[in-house]
Amino acid sequence: MTVKETIMKKLLTSAALALTLTTAGMTSYAVNWVYLGQDGNDRIYYDTSSVSRQGNLVAVTMQEREADGEAEEYNYLFDTHRKKYTLASKIEYDRNGNVKKIETFHESDFGWKKVKENSEEELLYKQIVNKPATASL
């Protein structure tokens, strides 16, 4: 690994950690959920107020609402130059909105994955990549 790659990895890891710390607490106050589509019985939304951008990195919160009323919320970090993403955190809610489980991830845990065609991540990526951010990281 070159020095440049090591520095980039450290910067991306720091950005992912900053995303986790700043958006995990904010998402419970989100009021701008926009419908993205269906995944089986789940309805997918993203929070327009959570979109933040720093250079080629875009942070966003997505939520999957299940038919039984439970929900899962994901905090993503997208690298728009490489068309890749990593997951910073996942929060599971019961049908009453109570938190069941919180997971946070480091880049080394989840890694950077390519945005695949026809995936939830691609749907989200297409929505945020060309839209102005409401905040910066």
Describe the predicted segments one by one:
Residues T2-V3, Y29:
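Intrinsically disordered, low-complexity and often Lys/Arg-enriched segments
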Residues T13-L21, G25:
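Hydrophobic helical h-region of N-terminal Sec-dependent signal peptides
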Residues V3-A15:
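Bacterial N-terminal signal peptides that target proteins for export
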Residues M26-L137:
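N-terminal secretory-pathway/extracellular module detecting exported/lumenal segments
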